[in-house]
Amino acid sequence: MKSAMRNNSLLLISNLSLALMVSFAALASGAGATDTKSNGGMFAARDAGARGDGTNDDTVAIQAALDAAGQAGGVVSLAPGRYLVKASLRIPPGVTLQGVHDAPNWSAPLKGSVILATAGRDAEEGPALFEMGDSSQVRALTVYYPDQRPKDIRPYPWTFHLRGFDNTVEDVTLINSYNAIRIGPEPNVRHRIRNVYGCALRRGVLVDTCSDIGRIDNVHFHCHWWSVPEVGGEWAPVHEYMWKNCEAFIFGRTDWEYVNNTFVFPANIGYRFIHTAAGEANGHFSGIGADEAQICVKVESIQRMGLLISNGQFVAMRGEHPRQVVIDKSCSASVRLVNCAFWGPAEQNVVAHGGRFLSLSDCYFSSGYSAKTSGPPLVEADAGRLQVRGCSFDAAGPGIALRKGLRHAIISENNGLRGVEIVNEIGTNAIISLNEPAEPAPAPGR
């Protein structure tokens, strides 16, 4: 059904645009005043009939320009304007769709090259707004769904769908995408997602079936991108929807994923690692952040070599049991966190019910409990093997709980607000040394 819907939509656009595409391609190949060589591979969407007035449907004209550029590869430029797009656009292999605004666009969201997307309301499984082929690129534009409402948020298909080799989404602002960027599930390699800012309501980036080093850099999801009155925004309902529903970064099968300088506020789950029909993820995650989340990082299933997470900042404060890192029983691989900070009113910082190895090094742990109120252990594990070294525990009560089921632990060189209180239920299977001794709990009322 999903494939038929996508194919029917793309066939309709192709048929509607045939005459315009032929005439525009003839101009580009030499039948008119210019040709592909003399214009340097640049194609203007307005030369193909796009108006950019926000009223007339520009879908057919933009697709005609894209198809003309696809004959030999090239760039389709979108001059400043508001381009109403009522169906899916196919970006052919070797083609770039390029607007004029490289910077994030918050205070004046409808300036520059803006796509007004209206297709797919209540049809989440339909074709994406941009269906991207091998070595295609979309950059320097803004996407806005004018029919979406903050108090009546409805499902829409993905804004971007990447498949194949070497796709790029860069310098893009998303005002109110329901589902933002999907990579796969078709086989793909070496995606590049760079400098994407905006509001992703339900899902931000989903990666799957990537067999060779994808890269995600400088991606920032925040509810305030859909708070400006000019685009019908409203902080409170958008904020609430995101912390209840948004999964910002989801990783299925991806080999050697590189993720740097990414952030979400707020979220149901900031970073989620799942099993799909294609497999699981491994990779390097540096400078990542999740704020006002229910769970910042949720590890359900990963490849055996696992995850390397460094310089992360995690704040959990929503839901019944806010926690920063949760490793499920279904995980049987390695998770390593270095130089990360955990703060805010979280109930716990790291909870591990699975995993082959878990390593926490040079991290700062704290919770919303006051210095005089003892809460649950900040770090708790009941499976796999655990190492905690060189960390600081800035809260009252137990810092670490080694529960029955944990096979082995090394706890060393840690300090804390009142020393480091360690609950040890695994006896001699724990090596505990060189930690600041725990102080007695203060008397009631003191």
What kind of feature is each model-predicted range?
Residues 400-445:
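Leucine-rich solenoid repeat scaffolds
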Residues 45-79:
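Acidic Gly/Asp/Thr-rich repetitive segments characteristic of extracellular carbohydrate-active
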Residues 63-71, 83-98, 104-140, 144-166, ...:
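Extracellular beta-strand-rich solenoid/capping regions of secreted or surface-exposed proteins
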Residues 41, 74, 81, 87, ...:
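The right-handed parallel beta-helix/beta-solenoid scaffold, focusing on the short coil/turn
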Residues 79, 86, 92, 98-100, ...:
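Feature marks extracellular polysaccharide-active and adherence modules
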Residues 14-26:
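Bacterial N-terminal signal peptides
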Residues 3-17:
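Bacterial N-terminal signal peptides that target proteins for export
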Residues 111-130, 150-161, 176-183, 199-211, ...:
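Extracellular beta-strand/beta-solenoid scaffold signature
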